[in-house]
Structure formats: structure tokens, C-alpha cells
């Protein structure tokens, strides 16, 4: 019979000395079960990860040491809260969350010690850098696993937000392609629905993190940046010089230059839905239903099934309102060819029209209510090979300074128009009921 497995204490003021017979061992945990080697396998601004060994199970593990700041060390209340959060993280059991074997607070050395399972293939950034040619099918599998892990974290009561999700903190087993979310050094249990402290890696931080409040949807934004890095092999905002320039772009809503390098409209649309404003951003449970992740063929499109587009939150003003469709005479020409009709779509006070032509780009005309209550008109080209409804509507909302809830309405009208002239078009948002116009 195996002896009972010892468990590390939550708090340890003194560390056992390393075994004399092994000079490579730097220290042991309070129970003596886990032995930390001197070999460093990862590091960050406040954390160092070492290779370690589980003497009971005979397996290699990872031992992370996270520095505790002065504010926590000087408060018994904060220390107790830290221990409570560590206990909760130890209780997490999910196939896409890195297993946490033991953890304890070392008050003398002012560190939190965390022992986890070891992934020998490293993190996703290292793996993607090593393997340049990765099919989108594999990246979709990674994305689904990451979102499944986030869905689990966010479904806890209260929800757990990671706050520092990035490719460095997602670990992969190269033998079977399994990925797990790890490095919970900044993870936080949401004692309230809103929180106010700012921590994380700036390139992956959602804009609302710089404001007063945020919730678990900041992890979805970070996931979108992870997807962007996976697809392009380029760190978001690598075009910027320094923290201030990145901060300015994020707070002004300017997306990374790498996004323009994503040529596949469906992939780009999925990433953009993750990077949408917080009021329009979908939770992990909804993103897992997206057509992009449901498709399994090499071109990530299925011709044998009809997928429901991602549902996008709408303003109550336009909720459930149908799109009225009509044809209007047009005596103009496109590329020298006569166009006898234009397609007109109207939803509430928004009107979109364009020629019944599949010539690329499609010229569209939009009539919409401006912030001052007066109707405004704008004409714009839509590149069916490069643009998505969401990328264009987001740009229009930003450039024209429209309310955020206009975004899904405009995207829906664009997708509805394109479905009429190109039935194979894959919409980014849910297209509601379309009815013939009486006028």
C-alpha cells in the first residue's frame, strides 16, 4: 500500500535545507516532497520558474516563486486574503487548466511558492516560434481548448479572472497538441462584480483595465490578442516604441498593426469579435459556438452544414427589429455595365444600399442618424476578400464618433446585403429576420 501523499503547508516561515547528497537541489518544500533545482525554465517581472522534482510520484514538476509586494506583507488581512485565493486556485480541476500540486507563502523570503505540472514543450509563444508552419485547423483546436479553460474559470462563483493571459502563460504538450492555461500569478477571485486594480502585460490588456472597473471579459480581449499572435507570429503592438505609445493606442481604440496582416476574413472577424468594446464582447461560452471554431475542414468552412453566426448584443432600440429589403431603380453604371436596380436594406433609422453586383470592391451607401439627431450620409467601398462587416462597422463607429451600440446594427446590415448578392458569404454577426419592404 502506498503511504499517504504529504501536502505542502499553506504558510512556511522556514524552508528545509536541501539534501546534502544533491548539490543541484536548491531547496525543498515544507513537507520535503518537492525538491527545487537551480535550473531556471522561465521568468517574468516578479516571478521565476524552476525545474523541480516530486519525490513521491517520481515526476518532474515546475516550481514558481512569485514575489509578494510590501502592501501585502505589511497587512495580516491582505496575507490572509492571499492564502484564501491560493487555496481556491488549488481547488481548480479542469483538463485545460494547469494542475496546481502545492502552494504556500514563505513570509521570510516574501514569496508565494507554486508547484505545478511541467509541460516540456514550453509555452505557446515558444512553440509557435519554433514551428512556423501551423495549419489553421491546429490553431482552432488550441483556441477551443483555451476558451474552454476560460469558460471554466469565469463560471466559478465568484468568477476567477486571469488578468495576464498571453501566449507565454499558455502551455502546450507537443506530443498530442493539448494546451493548458497557467501562470496564475496575477489571477484574482472577483469578490465583487467589478474590480479596480491594474496589473498585467500591457500589449494584451483590454482598454477598460485602464479605467475604473472591469470584469472577466478582459480575459476574452487578451485571448483575442493571443489568437492574433498565433496567426501572425507577431507580438501585438510590436510596431510601437515603448510603453507610452502602446498605452496611447490601446486607450484610443487603435488595434495592432498585425491585425491588417490577417488576410482571411473569417479569421480576422473572429479575432475582432474578441477585441470588441466590452459592451459588445462575447463571453467564452458564446465564442465557443462561433462558426469559425465549429468548422473542421482544411479551409475552416463547411459546405454541408449551416452554422449560426455569433450573436452580437444589440441596443434595445433595435432589438428584434426586422430588416426591410427592397429594390430601387438605378440608371447608373458599374465598370461600364448598366445597373438597373440597387438593393436597399433598412433597419430602424439605418439604411444601407448598393448595386446588385459582385464586382469587388462593392460600393455601399449608408444613411444613419448622427449624434446631433440629424441624418447623415456616407459612401464607402467594401473589399469582399479582405474586409469583414465587423471591421468596417467598428472603423465607422470610431471615425464617425457614433454610439457603440451602432456597431452591431451596421455590421448586421452589411452582412445582410452581402448575403443577398453572395449567398456563400459568411456573416460575422447574427442576421435577423428580413422582410420585403412595403415602400
UniProtKB/Swiss-Prot annotation:
Pfam families: Pkinase (PF00069). Keywords: ATP-binding, Kinase, Nucleotide-binding, Serine/threonine-protein kinase, Transferase. Disulfide bonds: none annotated. It is an enzyme of class 2 (transferase). It catalyses: L-seryl-[protein] + ATP = O-phospho-L-seryl-[protein] + ADP + H(+); L-threonyl-[protein] + ATP = O-phospho-L-threonyl-[protein] + ADP + H(+). InterPro entries: Kinase-like_dom_sf, Prot_kinase_dom, Ser/Thr_kinase_AS, WNK_Ser-Thr_kinase. Residues 1-30 are annotated as: Disordered. Belongs to the protein kinase superfamily. Ser/Thr protein kinase family. WNK subfamily. This is Probable serine/threonine-protein kinase WNK6. One of its GO terms (molecular function) is protein serine/threonine kinase activity. PANTHER family: SERINE/THREONINE-PROTEIN KINASE WNK WITH NO LYSINE -RELATED. The gene is WNK6. It comes from the Eukaryota. GO terms for biological process: intracellular signal transduction. ATP binds at residues 116-119, 166. It comes from Oryza sativa subsp. japonica (Rice). Residues 35-293 form the Protein kinase domain. Its EC number is 2.7.11.1. Residues 10-27 have a biased composition (Acidic residues). The active site is at 183 (proton acceptor). GO terms for cellular component: cytoplasm.
Amino acid at each position: 500500500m502506498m503511504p499517504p501523499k504529504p501536502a505542502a503547508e499553506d504558510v512556511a516561515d522556514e524552508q528545509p535545507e536541501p539534501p546534502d547528497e544533491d548539490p543541484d537541489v536548491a531547496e525543498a518544500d515544507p513537507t520535503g516532497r518537492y525538491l527545487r533545482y537551480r535550473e531556471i525554465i522561465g521568468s517574468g517581472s516578479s516571478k521565476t520558474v524552476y525545474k523541480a522534482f516530486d519525490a513521491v510520484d517520481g515526476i518532474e514538476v515546475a516550481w514558481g516563486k512569485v514575489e509578494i509586494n510590501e502592501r501585502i506583507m505589511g497587512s495580516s488581512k491582505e496575507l490572509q486574503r492571499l492564502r484564501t485565493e491560493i487555496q481556491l486556485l488549488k481547488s481548480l480541476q479542469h483538463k485545460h487548466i494547469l494542475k496546481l500540486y502545492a502552494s504556500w507563502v514563505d513570509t521570510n523570503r516574501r514569496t508565494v511558492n507554486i508547484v505545478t505540472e511541467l509541460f516540456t514543450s514550453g509555452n505557446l509563444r515558444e512553440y509557435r516560434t519554433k514551428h512556423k508552419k501551423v495549419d489553421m485547423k491546429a490553431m482552432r483546436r488550441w483556441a477551443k481548448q483555451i476558451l474552454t479553460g476560460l469558460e471554466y474559470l469565469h463560471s466559478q462563483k465568484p468568477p476567477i479572472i486571469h488578468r495576464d493571459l498571453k501566449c507565454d502563460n499558455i502551455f502546450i504538450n507537443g506530443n498530442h497538441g493539448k494546451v493548458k492555461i497557467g501562470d496564475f500569478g496575477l489571477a484574482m477571485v472577483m469578490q465583487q462584480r467589478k474590480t479596480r486594480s491594474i496589473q498585467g502585460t500591457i500589449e494584451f490588456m483590454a482598454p477598460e483595465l485602464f479605467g475604473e472597473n472591469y470584469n472577466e471579459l478582459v480575459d476574452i480581449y487578451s485571448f483575442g490578442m493571443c489568437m492574433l499572435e498565433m496567426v501572425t507570429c507577431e507580438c501585438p503592438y510590436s510596431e510601437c516604441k515603448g510603453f507610452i505609445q502602446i498605452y496611447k493606442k490601446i486607450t484610443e481604440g487603435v488595434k495592432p498593426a498585425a491585425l491588417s496582416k490577417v488576410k482571411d476574413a473569417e479569421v480576422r472577424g473572429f479575432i475582432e469579435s474578441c477585441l470588441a468594446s466590452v459592451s459588445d464582447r462575447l463571453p467564452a461560452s458564446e465564442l465557443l459556438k462561433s462558426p469559425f471554431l465549429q468548422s473542421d475542414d482544411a479551409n475552416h468552412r463547411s459546405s454541408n452544414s449551416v452554422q449560426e453566426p455569433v450573436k452580437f448584443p444589440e441596443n434595445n432600440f433595435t432589438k428584434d427589429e426586422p430588416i426591410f429589403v427592397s429594390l430601387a431603380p438605378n440608371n447608373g453604371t458599374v465598370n461600364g455595365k448598366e445597373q438597373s436596380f440597387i438593393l436597399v436594406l433598412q433597419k430602424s433609422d439605418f439604411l444601407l444600399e448598393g448595386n446588385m453586383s459582385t464586382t469587388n470592391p462593392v460600393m455601399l451607401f449608408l444613411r444613419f442618424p448622427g449624434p446631433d439627431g440629424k441624418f447623415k450620409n456616407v459612401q464607402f467601398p467594401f473589399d469582399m476578400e479582405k474586409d469583414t462587416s465587423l471591421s468596417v462597422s467598428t472603423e465607422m463607429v470610431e471615425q464617425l464618433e457614433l454610439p457603440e451600440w451602432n456597431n452591431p446594427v451596421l455590421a448586421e446590415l452589411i452582412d445582410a446585403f452581402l448575403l443577398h448578392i453572395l449567398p456563400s458569404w459568411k456573416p460575422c454577426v447574427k442576421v435577423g429576420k428580413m422582410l420585403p419592404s412595403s415602400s
